[in-house]
């Protein structure tokens, strides 16, 4: 392998490693400067709330809120309202997209209270009113809040809005100016090398763990460790070629890995992610390893999932996380690749023990799902500890309103005497048990089931083709 080829290979490695930081902070920048999707521009340390008509695509079981966090001026105090038995999660994600802490129904917090969010290395005085200190690995982070909600039920939506009104973020001491935005890098850097300039600047501003900093040393020859003026203004032809080739190769590697995680027997439309912007939610519960086999990609009934896609945080696992082998990728290089895939398909998604999504394109007989037919899904007891939500999407996914989801909170849901829930998936509503009806589009579709803290060993059966009514 020649010198130029080795440099391009190294750049591909750096692209995979740095993509989560760049993609995550670019999205933070979009939210704070221009708005994100239906959310308006939202300053650091303030909340942006999705509404039922404009919620995150693919997460019809919850209402989501985002708060970009800036801890550069010191700690923040997060006030959380009592949420009772309703599923709620407050998920903390660092600049490198690592989930580093959780508060909520699973992790404690249903009674509400105050938490202190501290910047890296902070050792100041903790107020007595604070329940717990959450130290962020980076000075900029993201808080993702989800409340279980029946989006078509005005009363339930109003209850969630009332909960949101009880959310608050304020500085522990007198507020400073804080960040007006993220550093954008040297404007003299060539536009084609913008990714590398952002990676260089942001990796310096938001340094990762010690182990990752040691790993970064290998990228010295690419200019990524340079301080001050950009090395990408007029780079040598060899460096420019290596960076451009490496970016293309690294992107292809991420796309191939994303397909392996999301494919279903070689078919599909790219599926959906687990994160806030891309809409996927994910959980599990109980003890480590307590995730439904179907959520781990088991083939029963064609259900596929990625409960362990978000197991890439190896260095900073704070309150509410599970620091156990089943939830840690043993190989650091594999962790970097999973992190890049997660940033690509499900930015800011949670660990599989906090929630999980599983989907299928086929029925129990192995036939492709099609809206010309009707199907039943029997969810046996015990149900997931904190709920579930089922919806159907056309393949390929079509623009338009999000489909109606049926969840454990749907008013009028009919249960069998033993607690089993029988759901009917069809294009036309059934004559009875209308609350148990999951509408499906005409033509090919996929069914998506979200499980909020499922019990250990909970298995999702296949969809069975039903007789027309």
Name each model feature, range by range.
Residues 1-268, 279, 284-469:
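A compositional/structural signature for long, glycine/proline-rich flexible linkers
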């Amino acid at each position: 392998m020649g010198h130029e080829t080795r440099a391009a290979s190294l750049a591909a490695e750096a692209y995979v490693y740095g993509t989560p930081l760049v993609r995550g902070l670019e999205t933070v920048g979009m939210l704070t400067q221009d708005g994100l999707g239906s959310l308006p521009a939202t300053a650091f340390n303030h909340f942006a709330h999705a509404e039922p008509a404009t919620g995150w695509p693919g997460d019809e079981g919850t209402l989501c809120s985002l708060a970009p966090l800036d801890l550069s001026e010191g700690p923040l105090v997060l006030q959380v309202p009592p949420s009772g038995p309703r599923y709620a999660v407050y998920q903390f994600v660092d600049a490198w997209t690592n989930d580093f802490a959780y508060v909520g129904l699973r992790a404690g917090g249903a009674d509400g209270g105050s938490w202190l969010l501290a910047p890296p290395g902070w050792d100041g005085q903790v107020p007595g009113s604070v329940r717990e200190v959450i130290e962020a690995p980076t000075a900029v982070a993201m808080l993702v809040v989800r409340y279980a909600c029946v989006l078509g039920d005005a009363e339930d939506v109003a209850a969630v809005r009332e909960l949101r009104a009880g959310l608050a973020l304020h500085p522990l001491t007198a507020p400073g100016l804080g960040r007006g935005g993220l550093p954008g890098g040297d404007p003299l850097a060539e536009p084609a090398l913008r990714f590398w300039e952002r990676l260089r600047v942001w990796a310096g501003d938001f340094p990762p763990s010690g182990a990752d900093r040691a790993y970064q040393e290998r990228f010295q020859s690419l200019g990524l460790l340079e301080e001050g003026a950009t090395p990408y203004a007029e780079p040598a032809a060899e460096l420019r070629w290596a960076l451009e080739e490496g970016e293309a190769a690294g992107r292809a590697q991420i796309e191939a890995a994303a397909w392996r995680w999301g494919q279903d027997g070689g078919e599909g439309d790219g599926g959906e992610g687990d994160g806030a912007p891309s809409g996927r939610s994910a959980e599990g519960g109980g003890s480590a390893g307590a995730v439904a086999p179907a959520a781990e990609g088991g083939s029963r009934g064609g259900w596929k999932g990625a409960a362990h896609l978000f197991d890439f945080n190896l260095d900073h696992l704070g309150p509410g996380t599970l620091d156990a082998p089943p939830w840690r990728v043993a190989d650091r290089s594999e962790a970097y690749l999973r992190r890049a895939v997660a940033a690509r398909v499900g930015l800011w998604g949670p660990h599989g023990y906090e929630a999980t999504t599983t989907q299928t394109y086929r029925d129990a007989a192995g036939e492709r799902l099609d809206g010309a037919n009707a199907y039943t899904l029997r969810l046996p007891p015990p149900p997931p500890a904190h709920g579930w939500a089922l919806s159907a999407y056309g393949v390929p996914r079509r623009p338009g309103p999000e489909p109606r989801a049926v969840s454990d909170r749907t008013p009028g849901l009919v249960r069998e005497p033993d607690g089993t829930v029988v759901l009917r998936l069809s294009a036309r509503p059934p004559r009875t048990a209308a609350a148990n009806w999951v509408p499906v589009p005409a033509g090919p579709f996929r069914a998506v089931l979200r499980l909020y803290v499922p019990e250990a060993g909970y298995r999702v059966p296949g969809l069975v083709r039903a007789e027309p009514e």
